[in-house]
Amino acid sequence: MVRYKATISYDGTLFSGFQRQRHLRTVQEEIEKTLYKLNNGTKIIIHGAGRTDAGVHAYGQVIHFDLPQEQEVEKLRFALDTQTPEDIDVVNIEKVADDFHCRYQKHLKTYEFLVDNGRPKNPMMRHYTTHYPYTLNIKLMQDAINGLVGTHDFTGFTAAGTSVQNKVRTITKATVSRDEKTDFLVFTFSGNGFLYKQVRNMVGTLLKIGNGQMPVEQVKVILSSKNRQLAGPTISGNGLYLKEICYEN
């Protein structure tokens, strides 16, 4: 068997997330169906570096899969790209070592979250940004977001019911700025891993701070108390993008 690593992008609007689910359309299912056709009915299982939720998009999701025979990578990329649905793009494919695993290999993930703060909202972007029509103080959010950088237990920012035991993660970059062209707010987070709905919960909290409903110090309070009830709401995922995954070595 030969192992391949692929970088893919997708519009998450019509997907029920990345991971295969019974009777639901997912990114994993569509790619596996295409690989099945390309390999004469051989079942191929793909593995993803991140499991994006319904409606969440990706510019740089990484997957890996094993094929029975070695193939020329550009021909494989082109075939997979042209035969998957229009809302999936296969950006790059490369042959990797047999022990490479896109999820467990040490890596850095970057997520981006777009917020339309306009009144009225931009209806053309309703699937690609999350609308927040209330007044926001970006300076307050910038002060608060700095408290997320570093190694912390992010229990207070994860969704209830997660099966993950170790909730310590390291965030190396956390910024918020306003895009001058679109006027959207752009939240960017880079780190060695993120918990279930962590990014959406962090953005929901920062918006509350920007609106004056929570103090700037609330981020540190949530981290120290590990209390999800003290954080903001889980904001809708249509503004969330898995932007990039960088592997060591």
Swiss-Prot record:
Substrate binds at residue 111. It catalyses: uridine(38/39/40) in tRNA = pseudouridine(38/39/40) in tRNA. Keywords: Isomerase, tRNA processing. Its EC number is 5.4.99.12. Pfam families: PseudoU_synth_1 (PF01416). The keyword RNA-binding does not apply. GO terms for molecular function: RNA binding; tRNA pseudouridine(38-40) synthase activity. One of its GO terms (biological process) is tRNA pseudouridine synthesis. It comes from the Bacteria. Disulfide bonds: none annotated. The active site is at 53 (nucleophile). It is an enzyme of class 5 (isomerase). The keyword DNA repair does not apply. Signal peptide: none annotated. Homodimer. Formation of pseudouridine at positions 38, 39 and 40 in the anticodon stem and loop of transfer RNAs. Belongs to the tRNA pseudouridine synthase TruA family. This is tRNA pseudouridine synthase A. The gene is truA.
